[in-house]
From Swiss-Prot:
This is Sensor protein BceS. Residues 121-326 form the Histidine kinase domain. The lineage of its organism: Bacteria, Bacillati, Bacillota, Bacilli, Bacillales. The chain crosses the membrane at residues 13-33, 35-55. SUPFAM superfamilies: ATPase domain of HSP90 chaperone/DNA topoisomerase II/histidine kinase. One of its GO terms (molecular function) is protein histidine kinase activity. InterPro entries: 2-comp_sensor_kinase, HATPase_C_sf, His_kinase_dom, Sig_transdc_His_kin-like_C.
Length: 334
């Protein structure tokens, strides 16, 4: 701030120093003027000018320092009262800009809310014909066509479900109902929903649930597990997916292990990034790069930690670590 102040006042400083140099020059060339007396006056003037600059620095920069607070929260009351006409002009301009920004932000929030409501309404509307399509597919007798249509129906269903949860996830804290959940029925339901896809790809499941229940939100935990299972099925062929739960110390862990293509080591730190698919399979148009991102985002307010271990070409293990009860007290209170 001092450097900026001196740069701002450089014309003042240059003019003052030129004036003092001129006085010394005149005293030097004019023998009738005592050079020592003029030098003493110049010394006093410079000392006074330094004190004056320090006083003006303290006074003038107080207003501009208060602008830093305004930048963080757009609160005009945080700005110091202007003490000069120029500061008053700045304050009026900032107040006008603040009001404009707040109105613009309010309009954008309203537009986003309307867009979210319209999209969610559309998704719910689409679910009606999807349900009818599923009933029609179930009554089909030609097995090959039925299997293919069931797979395509499932893809649409999963994409709609992902989109629906993506819009809801911003308000997840208002949508939590934390309770003890039985893992077996929850996992079995998710596997059943993927049945047609798994049959088509020749995938089975090896389920070993030593830990029977966890403390979480049933709907959002199901969504997280759904993303891990769809990810495992998508990248596996003719193999088994292992699902295990067990106690590790005071915490419960749930593992989903596949024998698929695995993840390139350089991609592992990025798999939870929004929109990231892969650096090795850009031809894969089916991947959206949203499933694991949403799973990670949904896990955070539930205090679920997601770890991943992968060997490229050999498979991947995702581990969910659930919190103990006393870690969950503030979430339960929500």
């Amino acid at each position: 701030m001092i450097k900026a102040f001196l740069i701002e006042r450089r014309s003042w400083i240059a003019a003052f120093l030129f004036q003092q140099a001129l006085m010394l020059f005149i005293a030097f060339v004019d023998p009738s003027i005592s050079f020592g007396n003029v030098l003493y006056m110049v010394y006093l003037c410079i000392l006074f000018f330094i004190i004056f600059l320090w006083f003006r620095y303290r006074k003038e920069t107080a207003f501009y320092k208060s602008l830093k607070t305004w930048e963080n929260n757009l609160d005009v009351t945080a700005i110091n009262e202007p003490e000069t006409p120029f500061e008053a002009m700045v304050e009026r301009s900032i107040a006008g800009q603040t009001e404009h920004l707040k109105q613009t932000a309010a309009r954008h929030r309203l537009a986003l809310e309307n867009e979210k409501d319209e999209l969610m309404a559309w998704i719910h509307e689409v679910k009606t014909p999807l349900t009818a399509m599923h009933l029609i597919i179930d009554r089909m007798e030609e097995k090959a066509l039925k299997s293919q249509l069931s797979y395509e129906w499932l893809r649409i269903h999963l994409l709609l479900d992902q989109q629906l949860h993506q819009k809801r996830i911003s308000f997840i804290e208002n949508d939590l109902s934390v309770e003890f959940i039985q893992l077996q029925p929850l996992i079995f339901k998710e596997i059943k929903d993927l049945q047609s896809w798994c049959i088509q790809k020749g995938i089975g499941f090896d389920i070993q649930l030593e830990a029977k229940e966890v403390l979480s939100d049933a709907k959002w935990l199901a969504f997280i597990i759904r993303q891990l299972l769809t990810n495992a099925v998508k990248y596996s062929e003719a193999s088994e997916i292992e699902i295990k739960s067990f106690q590790k110390g005071e915490q419960t862990q749930l593992q989903v292990k596949d024998c698929g293509r695995g993840i390139d080591p350089k991609d592992v730190p990025r798999i939870f990034d929004k929109g990231f698919t892969s650096t090795t399979d850009h031809h894969d148009q089916a991947s959206t790069g949203m499933g694991l991102y949403l799973a990670k985002k949904a896990a955070a307010p539930l205090l679920i930690h997601i770890d991943v271990e992968s060997e490229f070409g050999a498979g991947t293990v995702f581990t969910l670590t659930f919190p103990i009860r006393n870690q969950f007290e503030h979430v339960i209170s929500v």
